[in-house]
């Protein structure tokens, strides 16, 4: 049976994911190292993991599999989940697959090297807007339908 795993630390689409999961009657796990208000929705389980690097990521990677959906902005976690057979979406609705994860990992590593080479660089990524939320909702809807046929 399909489950939805949310890497909740710094995830801007938790409430949107909950609405879609509820509509599909899919169990949703919101995984974090704390600081989240638990949902009253019986389909949503808030999982609080101990503090530490990548503890939430390991919890998700150890449990997801074929027919499950993972929402994360963490590219190494996405790679592990894809390897386990899960379908993976970024917060903006972009699907990460076995066909594109290698390039995404390489781009991530290149950007990390470029940031490290320029200690005076300021600013971050672009802001997360309505269009991103809309793409996420559409992507999650399609991905959950696909996952239902796999698991």
Swiss-Prot record:
Disulfide bonds: none
A Pfam short name: DUF188
Top-level taxon of origin: Bacteria
Family designation: Belongs to the UPF0178 family.
PANTHER family with a match to the protein in the record: UPF0178 PROTEIN YAII
Protein name: UPF0178 protein RD1_0321
Taxonomic source organism: Roseobacter denitrificans (strain ATCC 33942 / OCh 114) (Erythrobacter sp. (strain OCh 114))
Organism classification: Bacteria, Pseudomonadati, Pseudomonadota, Alphaproteobacteria, Rhodobacterales
């Amino acid at each position: 049976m399909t489950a939805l795993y949310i890497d909740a630390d710094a995830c801007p689409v938790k409430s949107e994911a909950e609405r879609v999961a509820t509509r599909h009657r899919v169990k949703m796990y919101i995984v974090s190292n704390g600081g989240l208000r638990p949902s009253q929705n019986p389909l949503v389980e808030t999982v609080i993991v101990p503090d530490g690097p990548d503890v939430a990521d390991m919890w998700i990677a150890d449990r997801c599999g074929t027919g499950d959906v993972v929402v994360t902005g963490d590219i190494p976690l996405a790679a592990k989940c894809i390897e386990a057979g899960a379908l993976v979406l970024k917060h903006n609705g972009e699907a990460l697959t076995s066909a594109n994860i290698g390039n995404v990992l390489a781009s991530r590593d290149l950007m990390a090297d470029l940031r490290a080479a320029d200690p005076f660089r300021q600013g971050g990524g672009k802001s997360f807007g309505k269009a991103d939320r809309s793409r996420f909702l559409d992507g999650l809807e399609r991905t959950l339908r696909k996952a239902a046929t796999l698991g």
